[in-house]
A protein has these predicted regions:
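PP2C/PPM-type serine/threonine phosphatase catalytic domain
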Residues: 1-234
Length: 234
């Protein structure tokens, strides 16, 4: 397994509210752990929400005695949701904060994926496939047939999400499991990448046979910034 991770503040924001956690080795009973979180909130609340939620997630996973990856991740996300919501209610400077979160662990030949919000997980191999489903207003409109995927990319409400950690007392988490084929690439990212770079361009960069994993990752960040870098990128 070869891994690249990075965050970038982008071209328009002063603060980076994206947060990434990567462990190729065990975290608790999980053999590895990969997480992207995209925080939201005024002042430094979004930065706090994403980083604190991931810290809670990792701590909970380390303490969990269960071996079922779905149960372990679900419990950890629920704990992070409760903590973020409680902190937002206790501290007026953090009021209204929240964060997206996409989490993955690879067990044998299977990836177990959890998602809240509009951060994404893709699989790239002979094409590109978005595994997660965005919890966003425009995606709901697409599902209902009100707008097309092309219209969704430039819709004025495309940044409005319908689920986030810290938004409600309980959090609704989507889970996916997929069998991984040899040679496939998994990409986890915030909307600062997926809103700035078309899926086809992502596939082109990832599939470049001349580039190594670090060069591909750097190329994705560079492409997002060259296209406007309107948000933080992870």
């Amino acid at each position: 397994m070869r891994i690249y991770s990075a965050t970038d503040v982008g071209q328009k924001r002063k603060m980076n509210q994206d947060y990434v956690f990567v462990s190729e080795g065990p975290v608790g009973n999980l053999p590895n752990l990969f997480t992207v979180a995209d925080g939201m909130g005024g002042h430094n609340a979004g930065d706090y929400a994403s980083s604190h939620a991931v810290r809670i997630l990792v701590d909970e996973i380390r303490e969990d005695a269960d071996y079922n990856p779905v149960k372990v991740i679900r419990h950890a996300i629920e704990a992070a949701n409760t903590e973020i919501r409680n902190r937002a209610q206790e501290d007026e400077n953090l009021r209204g904060m929240g964060t997206t979160m996409v989490v993955a662990t690879i067990v044998d030949q299977y990836a177990y994926v959890a998602n809240v919000g509009d951060s994404r997980l893709y699989v790239i191999q002979d094409g590109i496939r978005q595994v997660t489903r965005d919890h966003s207003l425009v995606q709901e409109m697409v599902r209902m047939g009100e707008i097309s995927e092309a219209e969704a990319r430039n819709h004025p409400d495309k940044n409005i999400i319908t689920r986030a950690l810290g938004a409600e007392k309980t959090v609704d988490v989507d889970f996916f499991d997929l069998k991984l084929e040899k040679g496939c690439t998994i990409l986890m990212c915030s909307d600062g990448l997926s809103n700035m770079v078309e899926d086809e361009k992502i596939q082109e960069i990832i599939s470049d046979p001349e580039a190594d994993i670090d060069q591909k990752g750097s190329a994705l960040l560079r492409e997002a910034n060259q296209n406007g870098g309107k948000d933080n990128i992870a």
